[in-house]
């Protein structure tokens, strides 16, 4: 069995899989990681043969997490890192290792599903990222913006007369008729404009309408803005399969 772990900015996700299927999946906030992870994985500790990790956390956090895993199994976790290229996909960053590994793994999975077609990959979480890939497998770069929660909190904390709590009903980019709507609709309008600009760029240069893939903790929230978008909740895990060459069934 293989334990896959996605160490994000705000949340921790994990799954245990064998050659046939996922056996257990879970996620939690970092503040709950110790109790949630141990409760979920303790029955599988002696059965796990590999631990594969995608982390955007600091080295200190990674070390602390490895110590936590040491209570479960003596195995040494294997960390994925961003690459210049893999499986026909070319990293568009001038310094490929600077691309977040979660973005790289999700791009690998997206490219594996949509080879020969351009696509946009949106990850909606603490940060919102949008990456562009053309029909030849060239990553053209991307955009990084505040996620919805960060955007709402930034506006509320910076303006004394604005006190808004995040809403998950994000489906309208028209002018807001209340402060709450004005803040949320502004985010929706900016995100819609970013996607439209990227859509036009990829369509013009590739001759095909690009696919929009949406992942991340707020994927279901932003999906309401883009009816053509495809929600893909486990792209990072699928990318780990590609990175560690597990697609042929060598899953432990």
Swiss-Prot record:
Pathway entry: Cofactor biosynthesis; coenzyme A biosynthesis; CoA from (R)-pantothenate: step 1/5
Cofactor note: A monovalent cation. Ammonium or potassium.
Gene3D superfamilies: 3.30.420.40
Compartments reported by the entry: Cytoplasm
GO CC entries: cytoplasm
Catalytic center residues: 102
UniProt: substrate binding residues: 93, 100-103, 179
Enzyme class, broadest EC rank: transferase
Domain of life where this protein originates: Bacteria
UniProt: ATP binding residues: 6-13, 126
Keywords per UniProt: ATP-binding, Coenzyme A biosynthesis, Cytoplasm, Kinase, Nucleotide-binding, Potassium, Transferase
EC numbers for this chain: 2.7.1.33
Catalytic activity: (R)-pantothenate + ATP = (R)-4'-phosphopantothenate + ADP + H(+)
Gene Ontology process terms (BP): coenzyme A biosynthetic process
Biological function: Catalyzes the phosphorylation of pantothenate (Pan), the first step in CoA biosynthesis.
Family (UniProt): Belongs to the type III pantothenate kinase family.
HAMAP family: Pantothen_kinase_3 (MF_01274)
NCBIfam families: baf
Protein name: Type III pantothenate kinase
Lineage: Bacteria, Pseudomonadati, Pseudomonadota, Gammaproteobacteria, Cellvibrionales
């Amino acid at each position: 069995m293989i334990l896959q772990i996605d160490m994000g900015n705000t949340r921790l996700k994990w799954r245990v899989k064998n050659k046939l299927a996922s056996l257990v999946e879970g996620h939690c906030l970092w503040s709950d990681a110790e109790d949630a992870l141990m409760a979920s994985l303790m029955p599988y500790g002696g059965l796990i043969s590999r631990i594969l990790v995608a982390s955007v956390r600091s080295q200190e956090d990674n070390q602390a997490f490895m110590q936590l895993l040491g209570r479960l199994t003596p195995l040494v976790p294997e960390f994925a890192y961003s690459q210049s290229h893999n499986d026909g996909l070319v990293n568009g960053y001038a310094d490929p290792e600077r691309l977040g590994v979660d973005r790289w793994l999700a791009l690998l999975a997206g490219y594996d599903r949509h080879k020969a077609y351009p696509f946009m990959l949106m990850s909606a979480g603490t940060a919102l990222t949008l990456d562009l890939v053309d029909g030849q497998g060239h990553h053209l770069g991307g955009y990084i913006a505040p996620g919805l929660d960060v955007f709402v909190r930034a506006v509320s904390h910076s303006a004394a007369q604005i006190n808004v709590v995040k809403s998950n009903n994000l489906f309208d980019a028209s002018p807001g008729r209340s402060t709450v709507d004005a803040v949320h609709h502004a985010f929706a309008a900016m995100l819609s404009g970013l996607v439209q600009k990227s859509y036009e760029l990829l369509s013009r240069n590739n001759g095909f309408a690009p696919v929009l893939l949406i992942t991340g903790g707020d994927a279901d929230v932003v999906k309401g803005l883009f009816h053509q978008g495809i929600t893909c909740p486990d792209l990072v895990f699928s990318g780990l399969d590609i990175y560690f060459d597990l697609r042929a069934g060598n899953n432990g």
